[in-house]
């Protein structure tokens, strides 16, 4: 290491206790880490340049120092207060025809996360996203879909301000955590019980594309509350309530329901089945409105086996879910990727839909995951138009890389 060479020439590194370096053989990283430990014990005797070199070495050998039991809790502050991570995805989908540019989609996505430690209680985070359609000649567009500041005065309480992701239901059938929420969130979670409240704009909700019900749908503000109970290592039950502040004000809204407010509530659970590797999960969500708007139900239930661990190549997961959504149940929602096609079909055609979802994932290498899904057996019901056909089967496969 050049850093150790500099410190040796400065007569700071003095070798093993017997004053030698054991000949000309190469030192292991753990032996070098032990030298760094000895230098850290004498840090007050080093000059500014030597301390800077030591800090750089401590960052380079952080894993070895941690394995040796050396406390390096302040190391990040010494070598910089910004950490970077990211993921990339290569994806092929066979979609429904609908309003999409083409039935078969081949896309790539790159996301870069930046987390800046402002102080012991505040972290500012951002995420850059660049997506490219490989069947289109256009260049990729890069946006920032996350920028928020999180304050955690203790291990249980938190407050988050800015554009962020929130989780409402257990499965993501109603709201995908990757969706954008612009607002403020405050919560408490002690590992057994959690409560969270938020106020802001759900930018990716289905109604954000809808100019029939709201004149300026993108600016609609909402508030939500959520309660969660944790038990076991990864089992939980939860319930939420979500309400739009603005009433229906679109020019095409029937006068009898103009000004009506729409809200949704839901409850769900994820339950591990002992040491079998199996778990069941599900959600029930009801979207309602006053002034005779009625209600629409959305529910899902499924069985999963295994879990993908990106540090363990060969680890895998399998799952199957059943989904049933009344017409209009998706108004305030933004579902997870592998369920979007059929739910949007029901919304666009004014019909209820029910279908099956099968999915699988496997860690093919460290930090590389192969995922696939297949939506099948879809049926339309309570059709607004009797000529509406059943949705076709859809499927997709993708490679995800974490770094």
Protein language model regions, located:
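Outer membrane beta-barrel
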Residues: 81, 87, 93, 101-210, ...
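Outer-membrane beta-barrel pore domains
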Residues: 20-26, 91-103, 134-139, 152, ...
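Charged interaction patches that mediate protein-protein contacts
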Residues: 62-85, 225, 230, 234-237, ...
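Generic macromolecular interface patches on structured domains
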Residues: 42-43, 49, 96, 124, ...
């Amino acid at each position: 290491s050049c850093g150790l060479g500099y410190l040796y020439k400065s007569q700071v590194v003095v070798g093993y206790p017997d004053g030698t370096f054991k000949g000309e053989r190469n030192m292991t990283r753990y032996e070098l880490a032990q030298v760094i430990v000895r230098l850290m014990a004498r840090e007050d005797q080093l000059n500014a340049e030597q301390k800077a070199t030591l800090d750089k070495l401590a960052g380079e050998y952080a894993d070895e120092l941690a394995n040796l039991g050396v406390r390096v809790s302040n190391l990040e502050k010494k070598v910089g207060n910004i950490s970077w991570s990211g993921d990339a995805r290569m994806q092929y989908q066979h979609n429904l025809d609908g309003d999409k540019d083409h039935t078969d989609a081949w896309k790539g996505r790159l996301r870069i996360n930046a987390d800046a430690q402002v102080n012991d209680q505040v972290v500012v985070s951002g995420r850059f996203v660049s997506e490219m359609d490989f069947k289109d000649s256009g260049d990729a567009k890069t946006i920032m879909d996350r920028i928020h500041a999180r304050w955690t005065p203790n291990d249980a309480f938190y407050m988050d301000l800015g554009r962020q992701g929130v989780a409402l239901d257990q499965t993501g059938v109603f709201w995908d955590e990757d969706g954008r929420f612009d607002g403020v969130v405050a919560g408490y979670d002690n590992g057994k019980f959690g409560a969270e409240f938020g106020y802001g704009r759900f930018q990716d909700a289905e109604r954000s594309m809808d100019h029939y019900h709201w004149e300026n749908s993108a600016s609609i503000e909402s508030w939500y509350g959520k309660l969660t109970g944790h038990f076991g290592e990864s089992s939980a039950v939860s319930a939420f309530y979500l309400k739009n502040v603005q009433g229906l004000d679109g020019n095409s809204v029937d006068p009898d329901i103009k000004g009506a407010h729409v809200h949704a509530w839901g409850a769900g659970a994820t339950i591990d089945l002992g040491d079998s590797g199996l778990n069941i999960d599900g959600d029930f969500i009801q979207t309602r409105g006053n002034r005779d708007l009625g209600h629409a139900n959305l529910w899902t239930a499924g069985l999963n086996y295994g879990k993908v661990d990106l540090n363990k190549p060969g680890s895998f997961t399998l799952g199957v879910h059943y989904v049933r959504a009344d017409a209009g149940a998706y108004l305030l929602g933004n579902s997870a990727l592998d369920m979007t096609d059929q739910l949007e079909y029901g919304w666009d055609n004014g019909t209820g839909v029910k279908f099956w979802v099968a999915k699988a994932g496997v860690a093919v290498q460290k930090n590389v995951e192969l995922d696939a899904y297949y939506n099948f057996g879809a049926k339309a019901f309570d059709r607004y138009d009797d000529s509406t056909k059943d949705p076709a089967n859809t499927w997709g496969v993708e490679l995800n890389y974490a770094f």
